[in-house]
Design a protein with these regions (language model features):
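Interhelical loop/hinge segments that connect adjacent transmembrane helices in multipass membrane
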Residues: 1-11, 188-194, 206-249, 292, ...
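Membrane-proximal transmembrane or re-entrant/amphipathic helices at the cytosolic face
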Residues: 1-2, 427-438, 456-512
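Signature of the first transmembrane helix
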Residues: 9-75, 104-108, 139, 173-174, ...
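Transmembrane helical elements of multi-pass membrane transporters/channels
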Residues: 13-30, 194-211, 225-295, 314-316, ...
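Interfacial/gating helices of multi-pass transporter permease domains
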Residues: 36-59, 88, 188-193, 227-234, ...
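Membrane-interface helix-loop junctions in multi-pass transport and translocation proteins
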Residues: 37-39, 43-44, 157-160, 171-204, ...
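Helix-loop junctions and terminal segments of transmembrane helices
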Residues: 63-79, 155, 214-215, 271, ...
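Membrane-interface junctions at transmembrane-helix termini in multi-pass inner-membrane proteins
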Residues: 138-168, 178, 189, 354-386, ...
């Protein structure tokens, strides 16, 4: 593996670029959600979320291959094998085109039947729901074909392009939010049409960039049986993991609709908007880190790989904790400040989904390491099998009369079971030390979280809800979290590194 310091700098640079993108996207996304919710109303907002969720369930067929495409492209770059890259890219596009056709067929038969026969949608809005369904299918197919292009950008670590195109997408969605307010037709249908149009524009933006900058990203129809066998072999087992994640997220959304109706789907949809905005911090960091984990494995540098896994897990959690704690202690006030309409159940949904996101965050580097090995059969059978339990358990509990938030509580519990399974399996696959992981990551983040959370949580009971309370509690949460991370969460070398960086920044400011 090349100089670790150089690789770390690349990770830092790419993370910084993605953070600049993220801050803009987060602000735009949250404001867009407010405008869209108020323009559509709670019921239509919930309908759009759950109908889109039906289409998203078909990603079970594509998600596994998407991971395979990313892994194969990144792995070949790590080995420096340029000759094989175009074969992989062209094969990937061919596969995605075929899958798009299969998914459209399934959606127009099984999906359409489920929407019209089983879904809990008011009769008066069923016509609009069907239009949303059609445009959601088209949008999904377009995004599916974009996967090989996105994978190439990330594998080449060209995060500036990824950032700029994502910003273009966010601006498009913000424009849509304002346009639906003055819609000349049914607002829900108009919204679905415009979202599809944005997907088409972004698809061409990714394709144009890749063709200009990466020689392998020129599509030729290739039918290499050996390569396709390798990719499908990898994807076949990864299918279990992809299916379990889709069934957990979108299946849970559909189950909530069956028992609780579209207004609760709206509450869950808002919670996931908050989660997506906050989770962008970790997503951006892992997008920059993932190629280095895969490339270090391909180059045989397992020591550097382990360092990345441990540090990546802790940093992922700390980023989420720093953002989530102020929201967890001020959820009701933030939602009222952000939205004019706050659907019932939204507060608890938001709090639970943030806890779930933190629970999942420490597994991201482990998942990347597993994918890097290519030996995923046992992993996917066990971990994917555990995740698949989300849907039947949630269905059973809702049928027994439990509150809708139980779906997220089930997901949190199973997430912890999956973490344990990942560690046991990866000990055999890559030799990861469970004791080191528990000591350096798991127990570390638990202690940091408890110490950081106690002062702001206690303070919430002694200050009346207001902007002053929001400001005080948020500042207190930030100070406690940063202090806990620095003094407890960081080791000596990491504290020294932080001190050096702060001294460097101070010196530059003083010279000016």
């Amino acid at each position: 593996m090349r100089n670790s310091s150089e690789n770390n700098k690349r990770i830092a640079k790419n993370t910084l670029l993605l953070y600049c993108r993220m801050l803009f996207l987060m602000a735009v996304s949250l404001y867009t959600s407010r405008v869209v919710l108020n323009a559509l109303g709670v019921e239509d907002f919930g309908i759009y979320n759950v109908v889109g969720g039906i289409v998203a369930m078909f990603t079970v067929l594509s998600g596994s291959l998407s991971a395979a495409i990313s892994r194969f492209i990144t792995y070949e770059l790590g080995k420096g094998n340029q000759d094989n890259l175009n074969k992989i890219f062209s094969s990937a596009v061919t596969i995605q085109l075929g899958l798009a056709g299969i998914i459209i067929l399934l959606a127009e038969t099984i999906g359409l039947w489920f929407l019209n026969v089983k879904m809990n949608i008011p009769e008066i809005r069923m016509g609009a729901a069907n239009w949303v369904f059609q445009f959601s299918i088209l949008t999904f197919a377009i995004n599916l074909i974009s996967v090989p292009y996105n994978a190439s950008i990330i594998a080449h670590e060209k995060m500036s392009a990824f950032a700029y195109i994502s910003i273009l997408e966010a601006i498009g969605k913000l424009t849509i939010a304002f346009l639906i307010v003055i819609s000349p037709m049914d607002k829900l249908i108009f919204y679905a049409i415009l979202m599809c149009l944005v997907a088409i524009i972004i698809r061409f933006a990714y394709g144009n960039y890749c063709k200009r900058h990466f020689s392998e990203c020129t599509y030729h129809f290739i039918w290499d049986k050996q390569l396709l066998k390798q990719m499908f072999g990898f994807a076949g087992w990864n299918f279990i993991g992809a299916a379990s994640a889709v069934l957990r997220d979108q299946g849970g959304n559909v189950v909530i609709n069956l028992f609780c109706g579209p207004t609760v789907n709206a509450a869950r949809g808002i919670a996931f908007q908050v989660n997506n905005a906050v989770n962008q911090f970790v997503t951006n960091f892992m997008t920059a880190l993932n190629p280095q984990i895969t490339k270090s494995y391909a180059a045989g540098d397992k020591e550097y790989m382990m360092t990345l896994i441990f540090q990546g897990a802790r940093l992922s959690f700390y980023m989420l904790l720093l953002l989530s704690l102020p929201i967890l202690t001020n959820t009701h006030y933030i939602l009222e400040l952000w939205l004019k309409i706050v659907p019932e159940h939204t507060v608890l949904f938001v709090q639970l989904i943030l806890i779930f996101a933190m629970s999942e965050s420490i597994s991201y580097p482990l998942i990347t390491a597993m994918l890097a090995t290519g030996k995923i059969r046992n992993y996917q059978i066990i971990v994917g099998g555990l995740q698949m339990m989300n849907l039947p358990i949630s269905y059973l509990l809702l049928r027994l009369g439990f509150f809708p938030e139980i779906v997220i509580i089930v997901a949190i519990c199973i997430s912890q079971c999956c973490l344990a399974a990942r560690l046991i399996l990866l000990k055999k696959m890559i030799g990861i030390s469970m004791q080191k992981y528990l000591k350096k990551v798991y127990f570390n983040i638990i202690i940091v979280s408890i110490i950081a959370a106690i002062p702001p949580c206690i303070s919430t009971y002694y200050i009346d809800e207001s902007f002053v309370k929001f400001t005080i509690i948020s500042l207190l949460a930030a100070i406690c979290t940063i202090s806990s991370i620095y003094f407890i969460g960081c080791n000596y070398q990491e504290r020294q590194f932080i001190q050096q960086k702060l001294s460097s920044i101070k010196s530059k400011i003083t010279r000016k």
